[in-house]
């Protein structure tokens, strides 16, 4: 977006730092999850091309994110085994209590005389927002406490958690003091925190800005004992003016050419502006949300329709007169979700809408785009009591 981000620019930034690698300097490229989905191409090949690109870029470590289960646990495992880098999912186990096949619980990096312990933590709400089936997600804090102890017993001087966690879960990790460094994803914020004891960094999304964290470690003698200390420098590399890596750019183009043959087919035209930016579809009624859920409702001949704004993904503004293509449709709706028609009571509809507006402050993807009904809500009210009214066919819909 705006000339920022993408694999080719990420590769250029990564190469700059990896050139500095030697015995006492280790440069690692870390991905905080949500790689396999959603994207235009992953909707067609279930993330295979994404892992191919991550391998080419030179990722060293990745934690699984909630979208890694979008195509089911079998595909999750296929993509993990396809990876040429270490994949962590420290608090995830299968139905038999074993780690997800191909992942590791912890890792240890040796940097000169120092040992850096690494864990990867996944938000437990995967079971609500994706398709993990029988995979289980253990409590984040319990896992962090257990693994921090294990890593220290293995001689770790510094403990790093790569987290694909909600903001509140990130805060709990930092406040606990269990880890020294938290590198997080999921919320897509730019976070830059260092209180002298713990460091927390989040680099947003899509490599628009690449987070760079330099950790300087040293040992010294004090009162006859060997001590260890560390300090950090944090910054972001804005990729807007970064030159693309030519090899990776060529690889990206080959995938884009493949897509173009199938998707650059015009299927319609918009007569009014459509806004699919995240801040719009996740916080308010949006024309594009109305259009999408109207089509879903018409497709199954339902009386009303509700879809979550977080399923609308392209983050674009379509000016009036824009020709709409297959590419646009798949960019906006990459998940391959199924439209379900079912009977609901008035109270169940109210409950669904309450759930939809319960996490607007966190920019959650559950905000309801609706068809066939209208509702008003108060964002300042207590969660669970925010919906003020619901109308169906011009009449109030009973809450009871």
Where are these regions (language model features)?
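Short acidic (Asp/Glu) and glycine-rich catalytic loops that position anionic groups and cofactors
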Residues: 192, 229-232, 270-276, 328-335
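Hard-cation-handling environments
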Residues: 243-324, 362
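Charged/polar, solvent-exposed surface patches and flexible loops
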Residues: 12, 16-19, 78, 146, ...
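Acidic, metal/ion-coordinating pockets
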Residues: 1-244, 254, 281-295, 305, ...
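Generic hydrophobic alpha-helical membrane-segment signal
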Residues: 22, 174, 202, 253, ...
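Amphipathic, soluble alpha/beta structural segments
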Residues: 165-168, 235-261, 373-399
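Feature captures C-terminal
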Residues: 2-9, 84-91, 95-96, 103, ...
């Amino acid at each position: 977006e705006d000339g920022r981000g993408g694999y080719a620019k990420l590769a250029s930034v990564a190469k700059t730092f990896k050139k500095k690698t030697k015995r006492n300097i280790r440069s690692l490229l870390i991905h905080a999850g949500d790689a396999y989905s959603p994207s235009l191409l992953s909707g067609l090949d279930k993330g295979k091309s994404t892992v191919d690109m991550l391998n080419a870029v030179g990722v060293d470590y990745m934690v699984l994110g909630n979208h890694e289960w979008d195509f089911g646990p079998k595909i999750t495992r296929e993509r993990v085994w396809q990876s040429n880098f270490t994949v962590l999912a420290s608090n995830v186990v299968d139905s038999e209590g074993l780690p997800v096949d191909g992942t590791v619980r912890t890792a240890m990096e040796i940097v000169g005389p120092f040992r850096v312990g690494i864990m990867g933590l996944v938000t437990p709400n995967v079971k609500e927002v994706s398709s993990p089936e029988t995979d289980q997600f253990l409590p984040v804090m319990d896992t962090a406490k257990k693994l921090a102890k294990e890593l220290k017993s293995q001689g770790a001087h510094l403990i790093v958690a790569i987290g694909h966690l909600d903001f509140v879960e990130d805060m709990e990790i930092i406040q606990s003091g269990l880890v020294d460094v938290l590198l997080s994803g999921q919320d897509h914020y730019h976070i830059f925190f260092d209180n002298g004891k713990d460091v927390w960094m989040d680099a947003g999304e899509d490599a628009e800005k690449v987070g760079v964290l330099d950790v300087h470690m040293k040992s010294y003698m004090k009162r006859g004992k060997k001590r260890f200390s560390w300090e950090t420098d944090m910054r972001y590399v804005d990729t807007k003016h970064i030159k693309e890596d030519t090899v990776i750019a060529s690889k990206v183009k080959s995938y884009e050419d493949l897509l173009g043959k199938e998707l650059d087919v015009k299927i319609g035209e918009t007569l009014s502006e459509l806004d699919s930016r995240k801040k719009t579809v996740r916080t308010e009624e949006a024309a594009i949300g109305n259009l999408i859920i109207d089509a879903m409702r018409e497709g199954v001949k339902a009386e009303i329709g509700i879809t979550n704004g977080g399923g609308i993904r392209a983050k674009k503004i379509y000016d009036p007169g824009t020709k709409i293509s297959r590419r646009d449709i798949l960019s906006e709706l990459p998940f391959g979700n199924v439209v379900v028609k079912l009977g609901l009571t008035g109270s169940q509809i109210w409950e669904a809408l309450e759930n939809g507006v319960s996490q607007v402050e966190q920019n959650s993807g559950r905000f309801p785009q609706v068809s066939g009904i209208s509702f008003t809500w108060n964002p300042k009210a207590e969660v669970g009591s925010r919906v003020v009214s619901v109308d169906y066919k011009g009449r109030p819909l009973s809450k009871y």
